[in-house]
């Protein structure tokens, strides 16, 4: 097997992912944020259930992913941007001159890591939140729950890949996080309540994520949601991710490290 075969490059990038401490730290942070906040929401709702408007056990479990995603954005940005800040990207390109192959291996290793971490985070958060809800809980086999959990895993995985693409475009972890964290944490969630901006902001990645997780509702129920369904949400999220990754590849191919 050639040292620059796809399998060898993927193995090398996988090793890089897990030899930096930031990978474990960011995944742990995502776990703590998602599970901790999801469980707290569930406990609070259970203790005051008669005053909860539009009670939905899925929202109690999965809304915390809107905070947990921020750690996965940081993970994606660091996996790429740290090589630029340290200068090790030059060494990587010397070892693997085929930039598309290197980029593909890096993105795939990061995406697989995000997928594995997201699966654990989503399942544990759901189970913990449902345990906290007690008699108001729902089960894994309830209609709509498996697709919502799968949607949450897909969303968290793709948002990490999206972050990797943006970090490659801007060639900096800090700049990528400076763009994405405010956008996902404050942007469409806050600005989405402005009627004039809704037609545009409803197509941003985080809004598609709400739809995928089945925790977005129509404006009539008090929660801002895009309302275009899971299929369209997945297409929108894939389009954003593909655009970011393709842009990242074009920048990597066309500019010196």
Region annotations inferred by a language model:
Residues 1-11:
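Short, membrane-interfacial amphipathic segments enriched in basic
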Residues 97-108, 179:
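Amphipathic cytosolic juxtamembrane alpha-helices at the membrane-cytosol interface
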Residues 13, 96-98, 166, 172, ...:
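Generic structural signal for small/hydrophobic residues in well-ordered secondary structure
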Residues 21-24, 100, 174-175:
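Residues that define the loop-to-transmembrane-helix transition and helix capping
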Residues 2-4, 22-77, 103-169, 185-196, ...:
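Secretory targeting signals
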Residues 235-257:
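Junction motif at the cytosolic side of a transmembrane helix
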Residues 73-95, 99-100:
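Transmembrane helix boundary and interhelical loop/hinge segments in multi-pass membrane proteins
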Residues 27, 90, 103, 177-178:
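Hydrophobic/aromatic positions within or immediately flanking transmembrane alpha-helices
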